[in-house]
Every structure is written in C-alpha cells, then in structure tokens.
C-alpha cells in the first residue's frame, strides 16, 4: 500500500493527465504542402481518399496497388486536385522484392521521402477458421511482413527528413473478433512490431515518428461487401477517416482511433498499457545496443 501511494498512484495520475489532456499542435493542411509521401493500397477505398486529400494539400505523392489502370486514374485526379507531383508504381505486396524496390523507385521519383503511409491488405472474407494455413501465411506476409520490408527500405530516407511512418491497422488488431482470425493476427502483429520499434527509436534518438491508426468499420466498397448480411453496425465515412489518418501522421501522434462509435474510442484507449510499458522500460539497459 505504501508503494502504491508513493510511486504507482502519482505515476498513474501523470499518465492519465497526459493521455487525456495533453494538447497536440493543431493540424494545418499546409503541413503537407511540398511533402513527399508514399501511399500503399491507393487504388480504392481509404488509400485513394488519402491520396486525394494529400493532393489537395499540395503534396508530392507516389501511390501503389496492383491495378495499373486504376492507379493511372488516381494519379490523373491527384494532379487535377493540385498535387505538387503524382506518380504510380503498380505491383503486388506479396512480392517482397517488389516492396523493397518500390520504395527506392518512389524516393527517386520524389527526391526523398517525408511520410510512408502503409495501408494495403490482402483480400479477406469473413469466415470461421478451420485449417486454411495458406490464408494465414498470406495474410501475415502481405498485411504484416511487407510493412516491415517497406519500413526498412524507407528508413534511411525518413531519417534524413525526420519523417513519419503511418500504419493503418484495425480494431481487430486490438480486440478479438470472430471470423477474421488471420486478418486479426496480422493486425495484432503490426501493433506489437511498430509499438516496439517506436520505443527503440525514442531511446536511440531516431527522429522518425510512428502513428498506428486503429480503425473501426469504414464504408469502403470492399468492407461493405465483406460484412453484408453478417455484421450489423454503422460504418464511418472513408473520406473523413482518410483525413484523420493524415492528420495523425502530420501531428506525429502515437495512435489514431477512428470509428463511428465514441464508446469504442473511449474503451479501447488503454492508459494502463502505457504505464506498464514505462515501468518495464526502466528495467532495460540499452546503452550497449545504442552505442555500437
């Protein structure tokens, strides 16, 4: 009890105050003007809407997805909206060699990189899991491993620009849902990996921010088709969702929550996790790794 009064309760109070009352810098569209941004999974849905928002803000954008024809239309519209420049590189994130080469090509097209927005996923349908190991492997490779490959390839440029990594995830990566086991596993993996390296970047003074975006049901065509007749809940608008993701990345927030339900946002935020992470971090001696 004495320990709680002396240490734990004050720490809890500080974290609660920080978590709920700390004010971020107000977002301004000009924060993205002239910035060099990659958006993956940008041929439709949230990715396409992010590309359009960035174009309106005057950013340089390079988009990628599998469909060359659709990407051509996205790039054309980005230029109409006022993008400083817009390019596409078509390919599949099932191919890790493509993922690595894509970043290098995008950086060359823009002359550097300020923000990497990781948004692509493999096709997912709602179903009970039985024995489809192939689908689990594919989900982990596309939804998780390719994100790591892209991040590793982009990091040298992001270090030079003090840039940002924006990781689009899901409530299914924070809370267990039925019928999405493989998808959920890949999204939980994103949280574990990127939250861990965020701590490492902080300790080793790597000035690259990582924003994890935790999304609920969004009214994209793909999502609406997948949940039709199965899930009965209100979907949030993809246009507004895309803007909130960009805002979170520009403001270098650790996490962005976007969902149609206020209660979801309130319940999913977990200050106790932050306290545990802080307490555990004090037990590590990382100097031997940082000073190599």
Curated annotation (Swiss-Prot):
Tissue expression per record: Widely expressed, highest expression in liver, lower in testis, ovary, lung, foreskin fibroblasts, and much lower in kidney. Expressed in liver (at protein level). Expressed in the basal cells of the corneal epithelium and in the ciliary nonpigmented epithelium (both at mRNA and at protein level).
Q: Indicate the impact reported for residue 26 to K.
A: No effect on activity
Q: Name one GO cellular component term.
A: membrane
Query: Does Glycoprotein appear among the keywords?
Result: yes
Write out the pathway annotation from the protein's UniProt entry: Steroid metabolism
PTM field: Glycosylated.
What does the record say mutating residue 148 to E does? In a breast cancer sample; somatic mutation
Give the superkingdom in one word: Eukaryota
What modulates its activity?
Answer: Hexose-6-phosphate dehydrogenase (H6PD) provides cosubstrate NADPH, and the glucose-6-phosphate transporter in the ER-membrane supplies the substrate for H6PDH, their activities stimulate the reduction of cortisone and abolish the oxidation of cortisol.
Its Gene Ontology molecular function terms? Answer: 11-beta-hydroxysteroid dehydrogenase (NADP+) activity; 7-beta-hydroxysteroid dehydrogenase (NADP+) activity; cortisol dehydrogenase (NAD+) activity; NADP binding; protein homodimerization activity; steroid binding
Binding positions for substrate per the UniProt entry: 170
Q: Which PANTHER family match?
A: 11-BETA-HYDROXYSTEROID DEHYDROGENASE 1 (PTHR44279:SF1), HYDROXYSTEROID (11-BETA) DEHYDROGENASE 1-LIKE B-RELATED (PTHR44279)
Family label? Belongs to the short-chain dehydrogenases/reductases (SDR) family.
**Known function:** Controls the reversible conversion of biologically active glucocorticoids such as cortisone to cortisol, and 11-dehydrocorticosterone to corticosterone in the presence of NADP(H). Participates in the corticosteroid receptor-mediated anti-inflammatory response, as well as metabolic and homeostatic processes. Plays a role in the secretion of aqueous humor in the eye, maintaining a normotensive, intraocular environment. Bidirectional in vitro, predominantly functions as a reductase in vivo, thereby increasing the concentration of active glucocorticoids.
**Implicated disorder:** Cortisone reductase deficiency 2: An autosomal dominant error of cortisone metabolism characterized by a failure to regenerate cortisol from cortisone, resulting in increased cortisol clearance, activation of the hypothalamic- pituitary axis and ACTH-mediated adrenal androgen excess. Clinical features include hyperandrogenism resulting in hirsutism, oligo- amenorrhea, and infertility in females and premature pseudopuberty in males.
Q: What is this protein called?
A: 11-beta-hydroxysteroid dehydrogenase 1
| The gene coding this protein | HSD11B1
């Amino acid at each position: 009890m004495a320990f709680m009064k002396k240490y734990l309760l004050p720490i809890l109070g500080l974290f609660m105050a920080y978590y709920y009352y700390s004010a971020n810098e107000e977002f301004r569209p000009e924060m993205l003007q002239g910035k060099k941004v990659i958006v993956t999974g940008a041929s439709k849905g949230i990715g396409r809407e992010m590309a359009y928002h960035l174009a309106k803000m005057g950013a340089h954008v390079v988009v990628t997805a599998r469909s060359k024809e659709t990407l051509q239309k996205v790039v054309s519209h980005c230029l109409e909206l006022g993008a400083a420049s817009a390019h596409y590189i078509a390919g599949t994130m099932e191919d890790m060699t493509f993922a690595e080469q894509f970043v290098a090509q995008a950086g060359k097209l823009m002359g550097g990189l300020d923000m990497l927005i990781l948004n692509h996923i493999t096709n997912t349908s709602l179903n009970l899991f039985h024995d489809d190991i192939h689908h689990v492997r594919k989900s982990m490779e596309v939804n998780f491993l390719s994100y790591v490959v892209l991040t590793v390839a982009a990091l040298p440029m992001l270090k030079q620009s003090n840039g940002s990594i924006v990781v689009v995830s899901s409530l299914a990566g924070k809370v267990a849902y039925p019928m999405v086991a493989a998808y959920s596993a890949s999204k939980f993996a994103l949280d574990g990996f990127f939250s861990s390296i965020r701590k490492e970047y902080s300790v080793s003074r790597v000035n690259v921010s990582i924003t994890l975006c935790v999304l609920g049901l969004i009214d994209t065509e793909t999502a609406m088709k997948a949940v039709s007749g199965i899930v009965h809940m209100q979907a949030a608008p993809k246009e507004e969702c895309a803007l909130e993701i960009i805002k979170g990345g520009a403001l270098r927030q650790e996490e962005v929550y976007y969902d149609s339900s206020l209660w979801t946002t309130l319940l999913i935020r977990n200050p106790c996790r932050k306290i545990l992470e802080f307490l555990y971090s004090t037990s590590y001696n990382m100097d031997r790794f940082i000073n190599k």
